[in-house]
Amino acid sequence: MDADELELKGHLKKLKKEELLRRKQLKESNLQKRELEYNNASKNTSIYISGLPTDKTTKEGLTEQFCKYGMIRTNRDGEPLCKLYVNDKGAFKGDALITYSKEESVTLAIEMMNESIFLGKQIRVERAQFQNKEGDNMHGKENDLKEFNGPEPPIKRLKKAKSEGEGEVIDYNDDESLAKADRTVIFANVFNIYKSYTNDDINDIQEDLLEGCEEIGQVDSISVSPNKGEATVVFKNNKVALQCCKIMTGRYFDGQKLLAFISGDENTSSTSDKNEDSEVEDDLI
C-alpha cells in the first residue's frame, strides 16, 4: 500500500473517531430533545394546495406534478395519497392535500411550487395544518377520480460526482488475495434511527446507494441495517473501497451526512478504541 493510501486510511480513521465522539457527546447532551423534535416534525409530511383551477384539476395531473419533489405515499390499493376537497354543494373548491413519504419533500415542494402557475392559475402551497373545516370533504366520487399510473421515479439521493477524480468507474487489476473486511465499506448515518421506514423506502435507499457505489467501482454485494442506521457494501478490491470512502465521506444522502470507512480498519484499533466505538456506533443517525 503506497503512502497516499496509508495517509487516506489514517485520515478516514481520524474522521470516524471524531464523528463517533461528537455523536456520543450529542447523545448525552440532548438525545431526548432531538427525538421529541423529530417525532413532532415527522408527523407532518403533507402539503396543502389552494387556488387550483376548479375546472381543470385532476388527481392524476396533480400527483404527476408534485411527485417530482419526492415520493408520495400510497394507500392500501396503491393509489397516491392525494385528496381533492369539495364545498358543501359537492363542487371542487380548488384545494388539495398531498402526503409525502418524507418530511423534506414538503420543504422542497413548497419552495418549488408556492405561488407558481399551475394550469394557468397561481397556486399557494403550504405545510398542512390538519384543521377540520366545516363542509370540507374529500373529492371522492368515483367518476371524478382518474386512474393514476404511479409517480415518476423519486429524485435520486446520490448524484454522479463532478469533482476531479470522482464519478469515474475504477477498474483495478488487483491480483492480491484481500480479506473481505479490507474491501468492505461501512456507511454510517445512512438511515435516521428515529424514523420509521417502509419496505419501499428501504429498497429505494439501497438501490440509490448501490447506484452511487457502482459509479466508483465493481460492487460484489450490498446490505442495509435501518435499525443501526448503516449500510454495508463489499467491493471487488481494497483500492476501490478506499476510493469510495474518499468520495462518499461527507456527502449528503437523503438529508443525512454520510460517514464511510473500511470495515477491516476496525481490526487494527486498540481494545479501548473498539469498546468506545461499539458504544456509539449503534447510536449513529
Curated annotation (Swiss-Prot):
Gene3D superfamilies documented for this protein: 3.30.70.330
Gene Ontology MF term list: RNA binding; U2 snRNA binding
SUPFAM superfamilies, A to Z: RNA-binding domain, RBD
Q: Which InterPro entries match?
A: Nucleotide-bd_a/b_plait_sf, RBD_domain_sf, RRM_dom, TatSF1-like, TatSF1-like_RRM1
| Keywords of the record | mRNA processing, mRNA splicing, Phosphoprotein, Repeat, RNA-binding, Spliceosome
Q: Which GO terms describe its biological process?
A: mRNA splicing, via spliceosome; RNA folding; U2-type prespliceosome assembly
Q: Where is the composition biased (Acidic residues)?
A: 276-285
Q: Which domain of life is it from?
A: Eukaryota
Residues modified as Phosphoserine are 163
Note whether Iron-sulfur occurs among the keywords. no
Ranges for domain RRM come to 45-130, 183-265
Q: Does the keyword RNA-binding apply?
A: yes
Question: Record's Gene Ontology CC terms?
Answer: nucleus; spliceosomal complex; U2 snRNP; U2-type spliceosomal complex
Give the family from UniProt. Belongs to the HTATSF1 family.
What functional role does this protein have?
Answer: U2 snRNP protein which helps to refold U2 into a structure favorable for its binding to SF3b and SF3a prior to spliceosome assembly. Mediates functional interactions between U2 RNA and PRP5. Enforces ATP dependence during formation of the prespliceosome by brokering an interaction between PRP5 and the U2 snRNP that depends on correct U2 RNA structure.
Something else known: Present with 1360 molecules/cell in log phase SD medium.
Protein name, entry field: Cold sensitive U2 snRNA suppressor 2
Organism of origin is: Saccharomyces cerevisiae (strain ATCC 204508 / S288c)
